[in-house]
Structure formats: C-alpha cells, structure tokens
Amino acid sequence: MCIRDSIYKAAKEIPIFFSANMSLGINLLCELAKTAARVLGGTYDIEIVETHHAQKTDAPSGTALMLADAISSELERKPYYEYDRHLRRAKRPHDEIGIHSIRGGTAVGEHEIIFAGYNETIKLSHCAQSKELFAAGAVNAAKFIQNKEPGLYGMSDMIDRKDAKK
C-alpha cells in the first residue's frame, strides 16, 4: 500500500490535514491561479518559475508541481509539464506548462506563475521570507481539524470556510 492510499484509508477513521505547502499565502496563490486558468482557458501560455535555497535537493519543488496540477485541473486540454526546454529547438507548443527551477543562496521560496497572452502578460507570485510561516500554517491546520469529522482536509477547506486565521 502506498503512502497516499494509507492516508485515504486513515481519513475514513480520523480527520487528516494534507497540503504540499502549509503557507496560507501559497495556497491562496494556488486558488488564484486556478481562477486565472479557468478564465483564460487555453489561450495563454503558462510558465512557473520557482526559486529556493542552494541546499534544496528536489527540482521542481512539490509546491511548483502543486501549482501546475491546480492549473491543469482547470484546463479543458490537459497540458504536459516541460522541465527542460533547452534540448528541443522548436516553437513552444500550446499544450504545455513550463516549469523552471532556480537553486541558490538562502531563498526560502519564491513562486511566480506567468500567463503570457497576446499583447499582455499576467503574473501571480508569492515570496516566503521566513520558514516561520510554514509552522504557523501547520498550527492553524491543527486548530482547523480539531473536532472535525473523519475525512481528508486541505488548505482549500480552510480558505473556503474563512477559518484560515482562526
């Protein structure tokens, strides 16, 4: 049984809170990106640029993939994720989301989503300035699921119920 299956099984018995990122801000960015994807549809090229400290070993980050998955869920045609465009010499296909990872210095985490359209570009971004915000998000999540019925909960549940700061 994989971890995800174990989580779903346990959620039948107890409340479980899961998020790839415990920052309220990054999860709000995720919701904004879903709205942008719904409104703009397949008419804009989409790119995600993420920056983290030099010690981070995974690329792209789980948060970048979470953002890409959220955007993808709102598009009619499911895009593929392009991580390494420099090897392919061709025009950009329309059915992709480019994901670019930068590693350096001590950056906690920065994510920018670019919707590039005809004669305009829309950019949505989030910059984590301290890891304290992830701890605060975890504490808020613990408070949120306190006394909840068994089930799988996430940041979108907190955002939807406006309980994020309680």
Where are these regions (language model features)?
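Short, small-residue-biased leader/transition segments that mark boundaries at the very start
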Residues: M1-I3
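Rossmann-fold dehydrogenase core element
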Residues: S6-S23, G41-I46
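Short, hinge-like loop/turn segments at secondary-structure boundaries
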Residues: Y8-I14, A33-A37, A64-L67
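Small/polar loops that bind or transfer phosphate-bearing groups
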Residues: A20, L28, H126
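Rossmann-like NAD(P)H-binding beta-loop-alpha module
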Residues: L28-L40, A59
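C-terminal substrate-binding/catalytic lobe of Rossmann-fold NAD(P)-dependent oxidoreductases
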Residues: G42-K166
